[in-house]
């Protein structure tokens, strides 16, 4: 039992550290950053989902990950936001980590994901 409790404590600590590494951004904050053209948004839901509907201006991570550095702004302090399906999806971390490893220091995630974005009445755009 003691080993199990130790395992849980370590696991929760790791999750807390990980969540702190890429802070959450609210839908309203992201919407404002988009309207002010102060954010690069990365969709991590896969190309098929991206084609069906994504946050306006978002990059398709599946298609762009090989040349992500060229897709991101020159300013390493610029806001970069990654998102996936919703609150239980952790796929966003691949893009967030990739941006972080490229030297970006203001990387956040939209934990609400595309489902929360749509549920809040925000618009999406489709890709050809």
PLM region descriptions:
Residues 35, 46:
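Extracytoplasmic copper-binding redox domains, predominantly the cupredoxin/blue-copper superfamily
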Residues 11-12:
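Repetitive helical segments and hydrophobic/amphipathic motifs
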Residues 2-7, 17-28, 39, 48-82, ...:
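Rhodanese-like catalytic fold shared by cysteine-dependent sulfurtransferases
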Residues 41-43:
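Structural scaffold elements adjacent to functional motifs in cytosolic proteins
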